UniProtKB/Swiss-Prot annotation:
This protein's GO CC annotations: extracellular region; fungal-type cell wall; fungal-type vacuole
Glycosylation sites per record: N165, N325
Molecular function per GO: glucan exo-1,3-beta-glucosidase activity
Subcellular location: Secreted, Cell wall; Secreted
Protein name (database record): Glucan 1,3-beta-glucosidase I/II
Family annotation (InterPro entries): Glyco_hydro_5, Glyco_hydro_5_CS, Glycoside_hydrolase_SF, Glycosyl_hydrolase_5
Gene3D superfamilies in alphabetical order: Glycosidases (3.20.20.80)
Catalytic activity: Successive hydrolysis of beta-D-glucose units from the non-reducing ends of (1->3)-beta-D-glucans, releasing alpha-glucose
SUPFAM superfamilies the record matches: (Trans)glycosidases
Misc remark: Present with 4280 molecules/cell in log phase SD medium.
Length: 448
């Protein structure tokens, strides 16, 4: 747990002097070596792992998402006609239960949903990295927060140990900011966009600095090869200049100047277009070890859902070519096999699905595209749907391996098929081994 006093001290000590730029790469080396501390850090474009990042997200574990673990939220159901009374996110989950009961249910979830055998399976299936989301409240809360706090960190540390034991690398992902950075349920608090309010920004900065300091220490650098400063900030509704100047840049300076670490930082693209970040934290200005994280889905708008499979694949391939000339390293930190939004609560509790026309959000509605019946039962999938899903997955893998690689969302769920890498592999919809291709060169390239 962190204190607000620590925050003030930390913020006051952040230096404004940039770290020594990393030397030019030795043509014979796949890694940079920083002059000051001689430590190596991972070059996501040039093979420091010996292959592209091929990872999985550990979603729905240390930060709840209703569609990943619906049983935790179904426990609140009072009728079969609608979702009234069901909490929409972890904030309301804890608020409805009270901290003691919420703590009991969450500890049961944390101790069972992922165990070391899962990480052994991940490694045996050929993946090389796990991205682990966690919310700010795991480390510090606002005065009126209902969240359970102070316990998740030990599970995160345990997971890093599991990863190390199985030769997996880790991204630690700050997935939820105080006040919420995007209003999504996956931030912990739906329908709020108050991340950059001064009090919320101060708490989130304090938490981030704690994460940076701890997981950039020598004991973690063999396994933790990136820290994501904040997941999916909703750029179109945020003050981007304030986020850059008051959150992202100070985090970099704290990491390089105070901690003296060569840890890689991950910046989500904030839903901005390709090349938007090219002039931010540039090598010419002395910055290094910066990776841009792009997330790609084609299911959260009706026009996307209406695309033919060939159109889906064309868009996926453009995701790869679109980042070829971005100046920073780039990785696709989230994508999915999904071609529908049928999974219950994918669009959040109470909203329905656009695909079958049941989606309602205020006065916004959707029109029927196709049926969602038996969506999570592979026995009801046609051969064409199976082939299309496999084609789409392979196209995305090829596209994302044009640069630094990919991290699928997510490794497992309680019941979803389209969003569960385990089920996808079991049913032949996701390649095993990961380099296997039934539909090679869909993007006009050969995968690594």
């Amino acid at each position: 747990m962190l204190s607000l006093k620590t925050l003030l001290c930390t913020l006051l000590t952040v230096s404004s002097v940039l770290a020594t730029p990393v030397p030019a790469r030795d043509p014979s080396s796949i890694q940079f070596v920083h002059e000051e501390n001689k430590k190596r850090y991972y070059d996501y474009d040039h093979g420091s792992l010996g292959e592209p990042i091929r990872g999985v997200n550990i979603g729905g574990w240390l930060l709840l998402e209703p569609y990943i673990t619906p049983s935790l939220f179904e426990a609140f159901r009072t009728n079969d006609d609608n979702d009234e009374g069901i909490p929409v996110d972890e904030y309301h989950f804890c608020q409805y239960l009270g901290k003691d009961l919420a703590k009991s249910r969450l500890q049961s979830h944390w101790s069972t949903f992922y165990q070391e055998q899962d990480f052994a399976n991940i490694a045996s299936q050929g993946f090389n990295l796990v991205r682990i989301p966690i919310g700010y409240w795991a480390f510090q809360t606002l005065d009126d927060d209902p969240y359970v706090s102070g316990l998740q960190e030990s599970y995160l540390d345990q997971a890093i140990g599991w990863a190390r034991n199985n030769s997996l690398k880790v991204w630690v992902d700050l997935h939820g900011a105080a006040g919420s950075q995007n209003g999504f349920d996956n931030s912990g608090l739906r329908d709020s966009y108050k991340f950059l309010e001064d009090s919320n920004l101060a708490v989130t900065t304090n938490v981030l600095n704690y994460i940076l300091k701890k997981y950039s220490a020598e004991e973690y650098l063999d396994t933790v090869i990136g820290i994501e400063l904040i997941n999916e900030p909703l750029g179109p509704v945020l003050d981007m200049d304030k986020m850059k100047n008051d959150y992202l840049a100070p985090a970099y300076e704290y990491l390089r100047n105070n901690i003296k670490s060569d840890q890689v930082i991950i910046i989500h693209d904030a839903f901005q277009p390709y090349n938007y970040w090219d002039d931010f934290m540039t090598e010419n200005d002395g910055y290094w070890g910066v990776t841009i994280d792009h997330h790609h889905y084609q299911v959260f708008a009706s026009d996307q859902l209406e695309r033919s499979i060939d159109e889906h694949i064309k868009v996926a391939c453009e995701w790869g070519t679109g980042v070829l000339n971005e100046s920073h390293w780039t990785v696709c930190g989230e994508f999915a096999a999904a071609l529908t939004d049928c999974t219950k609560w994918l669009n959040s509790v109470g909203f329905g699905a656009r695909y079958d026309g049941s989606w309602v959000n205020g006065d916004q509605t959707s029109s029927y595209i196709g049926s969602c019946a038996n969506n999570d039962d592979i026995a009801y999938w046609s051969d064409e749907r199976k082939e299309n899903t496999r084609r789409y997955v392979e196209a995305q893998l090829d596209a994302f391996e044009m640069r630094g690689g990919w991290i699928i969302w997510c490794y497992k769920t309680e019941s979803s098929l389209e969003w569960d890498a385990q089920r996808l592999m079991f049913n032949g919809l996701f390649p095993q081994p990961l380099t296997d291709r039934k539909y090679p060169n869909q993007c006009g390239t050969i995968s690594n």
